[in-house]
């Protein structure tokens, strides 16, 4: 009886499969090297100081390109400073000209700042807020419309959901005690529903003090690069130093639509210089004006 010839097909298939896997690995390695070379992909750092989940020493930064504007102006870039509350700083959000424009527009109409009474919805004087301010109607002029459109583009919240711009001025010693921007009553949510987010734009630099502080923020907030520049009030929580043109976005509600107690915030007293800012509150629904 003649012996059957050996079948070499299995080994050939195995060899072919190994070659395919090897080729895929080579191609994957090549793609990763390209991504690393162009800075699209980055290698995480294993430094002990940045290993904590809430460590702020490594802050996410992304550049947002200007469209149709002068390239000589400072570029905008984003700094995520906290996840509890969710807060980001948009650097160079406003131009110097826009900051000066809002200040000059508001100056003739400044009055002592008030707070909202939760029972009546009316404005009332309070010792917790010692600044002066005024409101600029939504869509009042071309410059304001451009700023409001920019806020909408950055937050993905329609312009129609925003209240009017509030411009505030703090002189030496003036402050705003920690508070929530969201409401705990039904009266103030009749128009537009709850406040979901706040965009706080800094219209001037402040020599000392005047920080926006989040005393209930979670995380190692003492790790921020500007920690040593903060006042004693500013070191009472996660703080942002006012810088002309920057905008602070923070959310008063979590992604599951519950109110976020870590969004508690205040304005530290101005120690040296003066502070100008503009606030845009954003609602869940359309805010009728």
Swiss-Prot record:
It catalyses: L-prolyl-[collagen] + 2-oxoglutarate + O2 = trans-4-hydroxy-L-prolyl-[collagen] + succinate + CO2. Pfam families: 2OG-FeII_Oxy_3. Fe cation binds at residues 179, 181, 265. Its cofactor is Fe(2+); L-ascorbate. SMART domains: P4Hc. Its main location: endoplasmic reticulum. Residues 41-289 are lumenal. Glycans are attached at residue 220. Residues 161-284 form the Fe2OG dioxygenase domain. The chain crosses the membrane at residues 20-40. Signal peptide: none annotated. Catalyzes the post-translational formation of 4-hydroxyproline in -Xaa-Pro-Gly- sequences in proline-rich peptide sequences of plant glycoproteins and other proteins. Hydroxyprolines are important constituent of many plant cell wall glycoproteins such as extensins, hydroxyproline-rich glycoproteins, lectins and arabinogalactan proteins. This is Probable prolyl 4-hydroxylase 10. It comes from Arabidopsis thaliana. The gene is P4H10.
């Amino acid at each position: 009886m003649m012996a059957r010839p050996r079948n070499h097909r299995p080994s050939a298939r195995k060899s072919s499969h190994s070659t395919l896997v090897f080729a895929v690995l080579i191609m994957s390695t090549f793609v990763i090297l390209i991504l690393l070379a162009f800075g699209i992909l980055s290698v995480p750092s294993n430094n002990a100081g940045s290993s904590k989940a809430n460590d702020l020493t490594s802050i996410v930064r992304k550049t947002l390109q200007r469209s149709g504007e002068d390239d000589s102006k400072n570029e905008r870039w984003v700094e995520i400073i906290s996840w509890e509350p969710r807060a980001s700083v948009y650097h160079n959000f406003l131009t110097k000209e826009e900051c000066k424009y809002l200040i000059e527009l508001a100056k003739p109409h400044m009055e002592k700042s008030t707070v909202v009474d939760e029972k009546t919805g009316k404005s009332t004087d309070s010792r917790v807020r010692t600044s002066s301010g005024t409101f600029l109607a939504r869509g009042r002029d071309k410059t304001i419309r451009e700023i409001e459109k920019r806020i909408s583009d950055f937050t993905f919240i329609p312009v129609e959901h925003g209240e009017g711009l509030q411009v505030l001025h703090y002189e030496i010693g003036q402050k705003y005690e920690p508070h929530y921007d969201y409401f705990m009553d039904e009266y103030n949510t009749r128009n537009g529903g709850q406040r979901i987010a706040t965009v706080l734009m800094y219209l001037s630099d402040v020599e000392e003090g005047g920080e926006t502080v989040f005393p209930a923020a979670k995380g190692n907030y003492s790790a921020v690069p500007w920690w040593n520049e903060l006042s004693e009030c500013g070191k009472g929580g996660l703080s942002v130093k006012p810088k002309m043109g920057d905008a602070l976005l923070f959310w008063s509600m979590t992604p599951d639509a519950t109110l976020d107690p870590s969004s508690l915030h205040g304005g530290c007293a101005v120690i040296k210089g003066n502070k100008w800012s503009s606030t845009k509150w954003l609602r869940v629904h359309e805010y009728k004006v």
